[in-house]
């Protein structure tokens, strides 16, 4: 699963997934 922050840099809601 690729980093959600890289697939959707506009979405900061899932940025704390790492």
Swiss-Prot record:
Its main location: nucleus. Keywords: Acetylation, Antibiotic, Antimicrobial, Chromosome, DNA-binding, Fungicide, Nucleosome core, Nucleus, Phosphoprotein. Phosphorylated during apoptosis; which facilitates apoptotic chromatin condensation. The modification Phosphoserine is found at residue 13. One of its GO terms (molecular function) is DNA binding. Core component of nucleosome. Nucleosomes wrap and compact DNA into chromatin, limiting DNA accessibility to the cellular machineries which require DNA as a template. Histones thereby play a central role in transcription regulation, DNA repair, DNA replication and chromosomal stability. DNA accessibility is regulated via a complex set of post-translational modifications of histones, also called histone code, and nucleosome remodeling. Has antimicrobial activity. Possesses strong activity against saprolegnia, the most common fungal infection in fish. This is Histone H2B 3. It comes from Ictalurus punctatus (Channel catfish).
